[in-house]
């Protein structure tokens, strides 16, 4: 047991070291952005709601970061912050690898298609491209808010109860879900967390722990893949990313420890209302 704990500590230290390395490379950081990262990290730790859906609209609406830069930076942010959680779920054996693989079969080509779409907008007309992505983010936030509000409703469990559990049918549905989420995540940095949890809860024959674990692992893999794509397009703001991570990683750790006492349902409702409001402004 001590060996495992020590290994986890080394692994965690490696992820924590990433933002410091980024900041050293970038040359400076902003205290305000570090505090923003801390707030996002705390919320993610308290509620398990994905970082992209919280961070991206804040970057666009509050900091006035260009849309495509905000999306690319949020994608890399998700990759790093979900790495620690993904490793922990793997240790706890709460990742259903078959479901994750089916999701990725649909997601990887769809993510490439989304990245090519952003690249096309950037080369042809970046102004209209930002407007298009803004609207997509707006619709995604409204949909996400509605999904989270519906999360505790009884119709979800009734819908799942009548689902055909044939493995081939479930696999096909997961591939389709993966394609939809992969394209949305690649173009908006939203969807790999809360939206996927809702969809897996309805369409996948998994218990709640495996739904969360599989979603986190999937989010880590797809964000790693999209991060590589975004790196080649040069949209990531490394100064911004390093400052955000300096606050976010300790925020996630603190939020996770406080999560047991947190009023999760109340926080989800507050986030849903904020997401719908922010999304409406961006449509």
Describe each region flagged by the PLM.
Residues 1-36, 61, 67, 90-181, ...:
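Juxtamembrane transmembrane-helix boundary motif
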Residues 71-79, 104-108, 215-220, 249, ...:
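Transmembrane helix-bundle signature of multi-pass membrane transporters/permeases
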Residues 41-42, 58, 62, 86-87, ...:
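Alpha-helical transmembrane segments of multipass membrane proteins
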Residues 37-48, 179-189, 222:
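Transmembrane alpha-helix interface/packing and boundary motifs in multi-pass membrane proteins
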Residues 48-55, 189-197:
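Transmembrane helix boundary and interhelical junction motifs in multipass membrane proteins
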Residues 55-69, 195-210:
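Interfacial segments of multi-pass membrane proteins
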Residues 50-100:
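Juxtamembrane transmembrane-helix termini in multi-pass membrane transport proteins
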């Amino acid at each position: 047991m001590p060996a495992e704990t020590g290994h986890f500590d080394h692994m965690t230290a490696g992820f924590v070291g990433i933002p410091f390395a980024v900041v050293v490379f970038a040359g400076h950081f902003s205290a305000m952005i570090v505090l923003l990262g801390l707030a996002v990290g705390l919320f993610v730790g308290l509620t398990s709601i994905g970082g992209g859906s919280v961070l991206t609209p804040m970057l666009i609406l509050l900091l006035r970061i260009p849309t495509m830069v905000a999306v690319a930076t949020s994608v890399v942010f998700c990759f790093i912050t979900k790495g620690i959680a993904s490793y922990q779920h793997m240790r706890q054996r709460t990742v259903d690898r078959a479901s994750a693989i089916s999701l990725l079969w649909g997601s990887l080509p769809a993510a490439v298609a989304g990245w090519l779409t952003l690249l096309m907008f950037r080369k042809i007309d970046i102004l209209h491209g930002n407007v298009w992505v803004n609207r997509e983010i707006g619709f995604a936030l409204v949909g996400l808010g509605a999904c989270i509000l519906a999360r505790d409703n009884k119709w979800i469990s009734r819908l799942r109860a009548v689902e055909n559990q044939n493995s081939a049918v479930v696999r096909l549905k997961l591939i389709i879900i993966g394609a939809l989420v992969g394209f949305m995540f690649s173009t908006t940095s939203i969807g790999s967390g809360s939206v996927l949890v809702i969809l897996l809860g309805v369409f996948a024959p998994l218990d709640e722990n495996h739904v969360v674990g599989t979603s986190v692992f999937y989010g880590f893999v797809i964000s790693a893949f999209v991060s590589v794509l975004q790196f080649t397009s040069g949209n990531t703001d490394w100064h911004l990313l390093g400052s955000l991570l300096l606050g976010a990683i300790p925020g996630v750790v603190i939020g996770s420890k406080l999560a047991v006492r947190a009023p999760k349902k109340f926080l989800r409702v507050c986030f849903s209302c904020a997401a719908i409001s922010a999304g409406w402004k961006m449509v």
